[in-house]
Amino acid sequence: RLGGALPELHLPLPGTGPNAFIIVCSTVPEDRYVDIDLGISVQSMLLQAAEIGLNGICIGAFDKERIRQKFHLESEPLLILSIGKGIEKIELVEISENDDHRYFRKDGIHYVPKVRVEDLIIG
């Protein structure tokens, strides 16, 4: 389900849905290292998508068992990537680690909060 944080908008709007979904799975039990590898691989795919002019989002809130059954997966689905050509203006907004992390829309712009680098580095 896309746009879960903005249910009143009934996203995606007709004709604006993603062109592809990639279900990222693991053949071994999920643990810390699987999650690290997941992050690296997904980031690489999203960077490549951006390089060729596409947008993408990670979907982590989904019914794993339903996806596994629907696509006859033997492996554990961990994340779904949604890839497509974006039509909306997106702006990143720097926030502190304690601010609200939910994305929002205002005046036709889709705002995506991102924690400041200074707040991510522990040292």
Model-identified regions with their sequence ranges:
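Acidic, surface-exposed loops and disordered segments
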Residues: R1-G123
